[in-house]
Amino acid sequence: MSVMVLGTASHVGKSTMVAGLCRILRRRGISNAPFKSQNMSLNSWVTEDGGEIGIAQAMQAHAAGIPPCVEMNPILLKPKGDQTSQIVLLGRPHHDVHACDYYKVTDNLLTIALEAAGKLMSRYGALVVEGAGGAAEVNLFDRDIANIGLARALKFPIILVADIERGGVFAQVYGTISLLPDDIRPLVKAVIVNKFRGDPALFSDGMRILEEITGVPAIGLVPVTDVDIPSEDSLSLQDKKTKSAPVEIAVIHLPRISNFTDYEVLERYASVRYVKPGTPLSGFDAIILPGTKNTIEDLEEVIASGTGEEIKKARTQGVPIIGICGGYQMLCEEILDSGIESKEGTFHGLGLIPCRTTFSGYEKTTVQVTRTSSGHGPFLEKIASVSGYEIHMGTTCRGDIREAFSGEGVVSEDGLLIGTYMHGLFTSPHVAAAFVTFLCDRKGLTWTPPAQDKDPFDTLADHIEAHVRIEEILPFFN
């Protein structure tokens, strides 16, 4: 048997709860795998065989102690703007689709998703399935493939997760359960109230009332916790809080920012601020231009807002600047698009590196990589090798400039301007620590990275086990 985790809304903590359950089951010797039929996210991961899936499912696979694979997230939607998304099907880019046309093909997609779930079950036994958004989107019941349609096909016991932090938890839970179709409502076996703040004893009556009005056991009141695992979507950027740290790094919060999880390890060591285009960049110790799902349109926003000139000014002042993936492409002199990434045309980049990027075909590079650092400059000399992954359309032709890593990327003569396609550069703690050390050295500061002596997935599992009656969930896996 397996379990399905649905939510009363987006950002209630489904992904984190699934990751915690995957680790709890693993610690009890129960083989399991995560599964999410359809995910909409610009944060993605590359599997060992070059497939692309949502980063949440990769994170959950790590919690379960198994390698991520494309069956864990067979349908990934990557928004490009103008109500258009790229469909990534079983890890490969399939086609772009307008929102009003997507639901015309969901029957076929549900079949693909169920086949993927079946393969995972035959391989690992149990599944911990994650729904998408809110479960009670009644206007989508007839075509939904992530919540109701999937629940109807799988018939797994359902755990409903609610977010008390945003308020209205009674309406969230009661309303969601009441609105579920008659054949789905009996599958709801447990409710978990997430993101609680304060003394749990003060909500004991609330848990009792939830059980009385829904007839469903309320098995957990889980306090807010700061566990160091990747975020899934851009809503989490709203929750990030700036902390006091020896250095301050600006990450340009592009309208279509992707893979912002690249910088979450840096947040352990530095004050990382996600600043929107138009925000003054003076005073930062480093600037990062991140990835984007639409390089051209976000580049136009960077230029129109004045941020492009701010970045150029920072370059003349010797501020370290790093462009990753789409940010790397923006640093180029010129971008040629045949209508693949955005509209057709030739566009001027920021002109900080002598390179040209070309989008000429509907082909995407998705690959895990390990590369040797060139060792050129005060940052790259601190690291020997790096591991990460590439996810990008287009190719960049390097001009008269040094290579940053073996076979990829660029670095300026002074070593302060770096462009690379490598996502995950800073998710390696030794690279993130080396970058912060480099920035501290420039300020004459002595800094030592703090030790992390416990697996964050074990920390998460311990936290959930302390506040959820796990013994009421375990029978679902017999």
Swiss-Prot record:
Active site: 325 (nucleophile), 423
Any one GO molecular function term: catalytic activity
Keyword RNA-binding applies: no
Pfam family of the protein (one): CbiA
Domain of life, source organism: Archaea
Keyword line: Cobalamin biosynthesis, Glutamine amidotransferase
Residue span(s) of domain GATase cobBQ-type: 246-431
Any one biological process term the GO annotation gives: cobalamin biosynthetic process
UniProt pathway annotation: Cofactor biosynthesis; adenosylcobalamin biosynthesis
Described function: Catalyzes amidations at positions B, D, E, and G on adenosylcobyrinic A,C-diamide. NH(2) groups are provided by glutamine, and one molecule of ATP is hydrogenolyzed for each amidation.
Record-stated family: Belongs to the CobB/CobQ family. CobQ subfamily.
Protein name (Swiss-Prot/TrEMBL): Probable cobyric acid synthase
Native species: Methanospirillum hungatei JF-1 (strain ATCC 27890 / DSM 864 / NBRC 100397 / JF-1)
Encoding gene per record: cobQ
